[in-house]
UniProtKB/Swiss-Prot annotation:
Organism of origin: Treponema denticola (strain ATCC 35405 / DSM 14222 / CIP 103919 / JCM 8153 / KCTC 15104)
Family the UniProt entry places it in: Belongs to the GHMP kinase family. IspE subfamily.
Entry binding sites for ATP: P96, E97, G98, A99, G100, L101, G102, G103, G104, S105, S106
Gene transcribed to yield this protein: ispE
Entry keyword set: ATP-binding, Isoprene biosynthesis, Kinase, Nucleotide-binding, Transferase
Name this protein carries in UniProt: 4-diphosphocytidyl-2-C-methyl-D-erythritol kinase
C-alpha cells in the first residue's frame, strides 16, 4: 500500500568510543567506535508529490544547502528502486550541525526507511545498507536504532548491549567542526597500519566509570579549540561519571548515574552554554 505521508524521527548519536586507525587506499579511514543513539532528534514529515520528479526540502528553522543528505538519499533510492514520483520533506532541525552527532546521516537514513515504507518497495536490509553507504559512512548505522560497535569506514556494524540507565547532558559550544579538517589534524598516513587499543565489546556492558573509552580526535581538537576542552571539563566538574567529545566534534557529552546530580548540573551548564541539551540513551 502506497502511503501519502509519513512522519519520521531521526535520532542523534554519540560516540562512547572512537579510535581512528590507518588511512585506507580509498581515502577513507578505518575506525573502531561505539555508536549509541540518544533521545535528541530531528522531526521529518515526508509527503508524496505525484506530479513532481524531485525532492523538495522545507526547513523553517535552518537553511539547508541545495545538496544535502535528504535530497541525496532520495536520489540514490529513486535510482536504485526505480520510483518516479517526487516528495517533499519538512524538517524540524533539533540536532546541531558540525557537532559530531550524525544529524545529517540520521536524516538520510530516516528518509531511506520512509521511502521504502511509503512506496512499498520492499528493499532488503542489505540493499538499504548499500544505498546508505553511498551517502555517507555513518548512514548505515542509523538504519537501526541500537547501540553498535562500528568498524571499517562504517560498513561493519555489530549490535551490542550498553547499560543505558544514565542521564545525559550534551553541550554544543557553537563551533562547527569539519570532519575532513579533523582527520587532517590527526595526520594519519595512507595505508598506515594501526592496531586497536582494545576490543570495545568487552566493556560496553560495564558501568561507565569502568570504561577505558576515548576519542582519538580530542587531543588535536582541544588544542585547536580550547572551548571544547573546557566544555568537557565543566561536565566532569559538575559531577558527570563519564564525559567525552562526540565524533569529530564539537559537541561533548556527560553521562550521570544520579538524577539529582544531573538536574543540578543541567541548570548550571544551561546558564553558561546556550546550546545545552538533556538526553537519554536509546541503547538497550
Amino acid at each position: 500500500m502506497i502511503k501519502s505521508a509519513i512522519s519520521l524521527k531521526a535520532h542523534a548519536k554519540i560516540n562512547l568510543h572512537l579510535e581512528v586507525l590507518g588511512k585506507r587506499s580509498d581515502g577513507f579511514h578505518d575506525i573502531v567506535s561505539v555508536f549509541a543513539p540518544i533521545s535528541l532528534a530531528d522531526e521529518l514529515l515526508m509527503q508524496r508529490k505525484p506530479d513532481k520528479k524531485e525532492c523538495k526540502v522545507l526547513s523553517p528553522l535552518a537553511e539547508l544547502p541545495a545538496e544535502n543528505t535528504i535530497t541525496r538519499a532520495y536520489e540514490e533510492f529513486k535510482n536504485f528502486a526505480g520510483i518516479s514520483e517526487g516528495i517533499s520533506v519538512r524538517i524540524l532541525k533539533r540536532i546541531p550541525e558540525g557537532a559530531g552527532l550524525g544529524g545529517g546521516s540520521s536524516d538520510a537514513a530516516s528518509v531511506l526507511r520512509g521511502l521504502n515504507d511509503m512506496f512499498s518497495t520492499g528493499l532488503a536490509e542489505e540493499d538499504l545498507r548499500a544505498i546508505a553507504l553511498k551517502i555517507g559512512s555513518d548512514v548505515p548505522f542509523f538504519l537501526g536504532n541500537e547501540a553498535a560497535v562500528v568498524r571499517g569506514r562504517g560498513e561493519t556494524i555489530k549490535r551490542v548491549s550498553v547499560f543505558s540507565d544514565y542521564f545525559g547532558i550534551l553541550i554544543y559550544p557553537e563551533i562547527k567542526s569539519a570532519t575532513p579538517r579533523a582527520y587532517s589534524l590527526l595526520g594519519r598516513k595512507e595505508s598506515e597500519i594501526l592496531n586497536p587499543a582494545f576490543n570495545p565489546e568487552l566493556f560496553c556492558g560495564k558501568d561507565c566509570r569502568e570504561w577505558p573509552f576515548f576519542n582519538s580526535f580530542e587531543d588535536v581538537l582541544f588544542t585547536e579549540y580550547p572551548a571544547i576542552k573546557k566544555a568537557k571539563q565543566d561536565l566532569l566538574t559538575n559531577g558527570a561519571d563519564f564525559a567525552l567529545m562526540s565524533g569529530a566534534g564539537s559537541s561533548v557529552f556527560g553521562l550521570f548515574k544520579n538524577e539529582k546530580t544531573v538536574k543540578n548540573a543541567y541548570s548550571k551548564l544551561l546558564a553558561e552554554y546556550g546550546r545545552c541539551f538533556f538526553f537519554l540513551l536509546l541503547a538497550f
